[in-house]
Amino acid sequence: MLLLLVPAFQVIFTLGGTRAQSVTQLDSQVPVFEEAPVELRCNYSSSVSVYLFWYVQYPNQGLQLLLKYLSGSTLVESINGFEAEFNKSQTSFHLRKPSVHISDTAEYFCAVS
């Protein structure tokens, strides 16, 4: 069984000191069997247009950009099989992978800008 860690914290960004945006990751740890699907949930709040990001930090490595939503298609895919879908009405940007592998063991961070 794999253990994908999703730090349970809230990231808050302030734009020009007048507008606040926040991200909430609801799952702190997500145990998954190898080759099983996984979904890491990310909800945000914002009163303005958003850019959304997923970062990954593998053991003993620095933070790396996994994927980002800037505009256009609501489905964003990464080169390693992960995807995230921007859902404006549900204010979510959940990260998914249909089949995880031991190499996916890491901490995953959602961010908004």
Curated annotation (Swiss-Prot):
SUPFAM superfamilies on file: Immunoglobulin
**Main location (coarse class):** membrane
Location in or out of the cell: Cell membrane
Its GO CC terms? Answer: T cell receptor complex
Cleavable signal peptide: 1-20
InterPro entries according to UniProt? Ig-like_dom, Ig-like_dom_sf, Ig-like_fold, Ig_V-set, TCR_variable_region
- Per the UniProt entry, the disulfide pairs are C42-C110
Q: Which Gene3D superfamilies match?
A: Immunoglobulins
Q: Does the keyword Signal apply?
A: yes
Claim: Membrane is one of the keywords in the record: yes
Keywords from the named record: Adaptive immunity, Cell membrane, Disulfide bond, Glycoprotein, Immunity, Immunoglobulin domain, Membrane, Receptor, Signal, T cell receptor
Report domain Ig-like positions: 21-113
Q: Which Pfam families does the UniProt entry name for this protein? A: V-set
Which residues are glycosylated according to the annotation? N43, N87
Which ranges of the sequence are coiled-coil? none
The record's Gene Ontology biological-process terms are: adaptive immune response
| Binding partners and assembly | Alpha-beta TR is a heterodimer composed of an alpha and beta chain; disulfide-linked. The alpha-beta TR is associated with the transmembrane signaling CD3 coreceptor proteins to form the TR-CD3 (TcR or TCR). The assembly of alpha-beta TR heterodimers with CD3 occurs in the endoplasmic reticulum where a single alpha-beta TR heterodimer associates with one CD3D-CD3E heterodimer, one CD3G-CD3E heterodimer and one CD247 homodimer forming a stable octameric structure. CD3D-CD3E and CD3G-CD3E heterodimers preferentially associate with TR alpha and TR beta chains, respectively.
What does this protein's UniProt record list under function?
A: V region of the variable domain of T cell receptor (TR) alpha chain that participates in the antigen recognition. Alpha-beta T cell receptors are antigen specific receptors which are essential to the immune response and are present on the cell surface of T lymphocytes. Recognize peptide-major histocompatibility (MH) (pMH) complexes that are displayed by antigen presenting cells (APC), a prerequisite for efficient T cell adaptive immunity against pathogens.
Protein name, please?
T cell receptor alpha variable 8-6
Q: What gene is this protein translated from? A: TRAV8-6
